[in-house]
Amino acid sequence: MFIGRERELNTLNELYNSGKFEFAVVYGRRRIGKTALINHFIENKDAIFFTGVESNAKQNLENISASIWEYTNGTAIDSAFVSFQAAIEYVFKLAEKKRIVLVLDEYPYVARATKSLASTLQLLIDRYKDTSKLMLILCGSSMSYMEDKVLSYKAPLYGRRTAQIKLLPFSFAETCRYFANYSPEEKALAYGIVGGTPQYILQFDDKRSIEDNVKNTFLNPMSFLYEEPVNLLKQEVREPAIYTAIITAIATGSSRMSEIASKVGEDANVCAMYIKSLINLGIITKETPYGQKESRRSIYSSIDNMFRFWYRFVPDNYSLIARGAADLVYSRIAPHLSEYMGKVFEDICAQYLWEQLLAGQCPISFSSLGRWWGTDEATREQAEIDIVGAQDKNTALVAECKWTNEKVDLAVLKTLIERSKLLGYKHVTYYLFAKSGFTQACIDEAEANQKLILVPYKQMS
């Protein structure tokens, strides 16, 4: 059953229904669901689907020829077109009479083996775009290649595409649709552990407990997720060992460049190059205090929940996992889950605020959200605010997010109010998010203060 991606499907269907030549670029990280999306889109449509392989031009030409002949004759035959230009031009001409979708999946594999492919496509698009009803879809997992060689203004295909779709992980709300049998708390835990990548979500069975799922995936040497982060890095980057060391450092608490470099044992400038690649892959993110531009106080954190969970808990327990001691390893992980979920809950709360804004239900019309941290000059102590979103230089919202088993009390609100003064906004709306709800005193305060909004987690899930 296909779940989600309604916006992307609508975009593809609008292109298809135009009846004229269309050229869409679909890209995103591995396991993100590109092929599943396209397969769902082309159901009941005239389509030729070709998947490139990491081989030479001859092999890929034979494969695309087979795909074309299978479409035209119903069966694949042995003869191949003499060139990619001949093969793709044949499809362009077929599409002069009827609507056809041509999908070139794993395009970077083919383009690397056939250096002239991009220029060939440019030539054919320019020649047939006014007469052919072809809908061409290029799909690729190599983010850097798709952005530099297909979408960049320097690329031969620049200016030819009519749409581009960058597939991102599912949001928390979208991910919850895969876990209908879970309680609200279990849904949050599942999202915090596997994130929003469809292939990772599918490894969890919502008819089994979170504990059983973790044991059967992350703590099982024969499971897909057990070696997935390392395997994915091997496919995407050179020197995966250094990348692994950097992600491990970040997942276990190092956030500043100097701390990461020290833990990895490499120069900070060297680490910066590797971190840039990890940011492009959507595995980590760079943060600066809200409202500031580039800052020496910038920090780095994991943006992909599955990577964060894996690097936080799996490497240190390799030996035990290899010996089948999943129960013992989970007993070591469990006490840290509440603390681990703190950052996940902040992300869930930020997503909730965006949903409220888009639904016209947020009192502050912010354009961005982020964390803020800095020094309280009065106390000389470090202060942090989980979420800040400004409407203008005078108006903002601030939020505190608590994933604990205790109800949030007035002390948390008072701390948030005091810290918000460090930002300098005149008009502030305060949000408190809580896994376990609020004390009566806190509820009474919210009823008396329209600038205070309490959001229990059960309201968000």
Kindly give the residue locations of the regions a language model identified:
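Phosphate-binding site recognition
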Residues: 1-331
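A cross-kingdom feature that marks ATP-driven nucleic-acid transaction machinery
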Residues: 290, 299-461
